[in-house]
């Protein structure tokens, strides 16, 4: 049985390039971002993977990444579920701000705490812990059952929503997950055991 879960962070967005806090705002992909998403599809194709179902967020940068991947695999019409449970962490009042401007307004130390602490949210926004509190139950109830049935499942989402998933899958502490970087457009391939524990993990770097 396959029992394969593939996580892909969306390709570079226009706001990644401009150094802006994005969160639930909805900028498109850059030219590089489109290329990263297509390259992710090519790497998955080279690995011999085909999907049974795909999941993505309610935000276009993840949806377009998902579609590019499926197009590269010749699976353009695959059933794809879109749900805001997989959305990026909501940065609240920081959304749309340049990160340097935010540091000037609130101070470098405070912005660093908001960005890199596990359970301190920015004003009006979510912490990584809050993000995990919506992502992990969605995974357990909606995504994982497909994987455990032996299917190969794609989740195309965002840096922090995927970090919340990886934290739970890998059994990481808050301190460990905060040090983990997730590059845009790089597939992370998990194979699960029948009891839902991780049998193997592979990162398909370029």
UniProtKB/Swiss-Prot annotation:
It catalyses: (2R)-2-phosphoglycerate = (2R)-3-phosphoglycerate. Substrate binds at residues 9-16, 22-23, 61, 88-91, 99, 115-116, 159-160. It is an enzyme of class 5 (isomerase). One of its GO terms (biological process) is glycolytic process. Pathway: Carbohydrate degradation; glycolysis; pyruvate from D-glyceraldehyde 3-phosphate: step 3/5. The active site is at residues 10, 88. Its EC number is 5.4.2.11. The record marks 158 as: Transition state stabilizer. Keywords: Gluconeogenesis, Glycolysis, Isomerase. GO terms for molecular function: phosphoglycerate mutase activity. PANTHER family: PHOSPHOGLYCERATE MUTASE. NCBIfam families: pgm_1 (TIGR01258), PRK01295.1 (NF002339). Homodimer. Catalyzes the interconversion of 2-phosphoglycerate and 3-phosphoglycerate. Belongs to the phosphoglycerate mutase family. BPG-dependent PGAM subfamily. This is 2,3-bisphosphoglycerate-dependent phosphoglycerate mutase.
């Amino acid at each position: 049985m396959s029992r394969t879960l593939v996580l892909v962070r969306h390709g570079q967005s226009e706001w990644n390039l401009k150094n802006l806090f994005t969160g639930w705002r909805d900028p498109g992909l850059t030219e590089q971002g489109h290329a990263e998403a297509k390259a992710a599809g090519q790497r998955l194709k080279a690995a011999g993977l085909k999907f049974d179902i795909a999941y993505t967020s309610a935000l276009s940068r993840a949806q377009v990444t998902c579609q590019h991947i499926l197009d590269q695999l010749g699976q353009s019409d695959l059933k794809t579920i879109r749900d805001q449970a997989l959305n990026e962490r909501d940065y609240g009042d920081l959304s749309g701000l340049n990160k340097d401007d935010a540091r000037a307004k609130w101070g470098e130390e405070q912005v660093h705490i908001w960005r890199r602490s596990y359970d301190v949210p920015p004003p009006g926004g979510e912490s990584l812990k809050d993000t995990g509190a919506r992502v992990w139950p969605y995974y357990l109830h909606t995504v994982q059952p497909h994987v455990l049935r032996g299917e190969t499942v794609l989740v195309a989402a965002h840096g922090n929503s995927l970090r919340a998933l990886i934290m739970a899958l890998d059994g990481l502490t808050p301190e460990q997950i905060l040090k983990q970087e997730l590059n845009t457009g790089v597939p992370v391939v998990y194979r699960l055991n029948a009891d839902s524990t991780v049998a193997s993990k592979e990162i398909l770097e370029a």
